[in-house]
A protein has these predicted regions:
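Pyridoxal 5′-phosphate
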Residues: 1-183
């Protein structure tokens, strides 16, 4: 009997072309991209900058706005905790997130709440979709950030990000999207 892998919401196989490219930089072009003073570092730097341009093109950003981290947890912490620091300076200390966020988002949010930030947890409907009406009702002038995942890592449910963004259109809150499962 052939095994069936049924956890593709959490982890999928790496595209062969991507694996080959990563392997090339791990085995052959293994220089330090922060040390472009020699050939290995220069080639590694060129690889990182190409990856930065490729990611920027996919997400309609400028390459200089793409920051690489070790993974989704570090990225979420950087975004949420960094925003919180800025929020303290401007008096905006309210975060909103959905009830079904990954722990990589929930843990920093809970930490912020324990340190005095206000947090609103949005409910989802019976299909696991965030209720945009509840988001609109939860917004306040001191709302700093709304964090909604793109695709749920357990159910595969896609969130209505266009509607979420539209609800924030006239508000000054940041929209943080954990897109690790949907990129």
């Amino acid at each position: 009997m052939m095994p069936a892998y049924l956890d593709c919401n959490a982890t999928t196989p790496v595209e062969k072309e991507v694996a080959r490219e990563v392997s090339r930089f791990l085995v052959e072009e293994y220089g330090n991209p922060a040390s472009p003073v020699h050939m290995y570092g220069t080639i590694a730097r060129m690889g990182v900058e190409k990856a930065r341009r490729d990611v920027a093109a996919v997400v309609a950003a400028q390459p200089e706005d793409v920051i690489f981290t070790s993974g989704a947890t570090e990225s979420n912490n950087l975004a949420l905790l960094g925003l919180a620091e800025a929020g303290l300076r401007c008096g905006r200390t309210h975060f909103i997130c959905s009830a079904i966020e990954h722990k990589a988002v929930l843990e920093p949010i809970e930490s912020l709440q324990a340190s005095g930030f206000e947090v609103t947890i949005l409910p989802v409907d019976r299909t696991g979709v965030v209720r945009v009406e509840a988001l609109a009702e939860a917004l306040r002038p001191e709302t700093l950030c709304v964090s909604i995942m793109h695709v749920n890592n357990e159910t595969g449910v896609l969130q209505p990000l266009d509607e979420v963004a539209k609800a924030l259109q006239d508000h000054h809150a940041w929209l943080h999207i954990d897109a690790a499962q949907g990129f």
